[in-house]
Amino acid sequence: TQHLPYTRCKMAMSLDGRTALANGESQWISSELSRRDVHHLRAASSAILTSVETLLKDDASLNARGLDFEFKQAVRIIIDRKLKTPNQAKLFSIPGHTLIYTENDNDTRIHELENVGAEVVFLKNTESWLKEVFNHMAKEFEINELEAGSTFSGALIEQGLVDELVVYIAPILLGHSANPLVKLKELKKIGEAKQLKIMDVRQVGKDFRFILTL
């Protein structure tokens, strides 16, 4: 059997289950206290994981900041099948280790990314490529913090690669055209729905934080 890292998926949504407006605007759905809480989660993680699509959209730093205790920064991991990560991405200008998993063996692109500080891991494309990536990650990382969009997070949930959801719910309404929390395949029966177990609920600032296991 494959050994996989424990993967916690962090999400923030409105009361009507939306994460971003249709035009992509998503900043500051959750409160400042919730965002600070996320930095605690990051500090407790071995790796912070995202997709290249999320990186291209947000250019996030993927590090823990503003904490008043000592901790080791998590390794930043980008899942980037085609090596679309920009050489100028903000995270390359910040101290820390960045790891890119890809199925693209283009030596020129690999060397470009290595020159700006990335470690690039090539894994041959297979039907279970994402599981192979997670199996490889498990050699070094025990706890992953997943911070990505609804499509990538949904794909990992459907493949059984996510163990826990941390969902911040803000008391706002974004409307039916805004993006959903997670994109999963269409169900034909309620009985097919993925069951989750609520482990903890607490108020964080004006938001509520749910911790659920899958």
Language-model region placement:
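Enzymes that bind and transform nitrogen-containing heteroaromatic metabolites
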Residues: 5-214
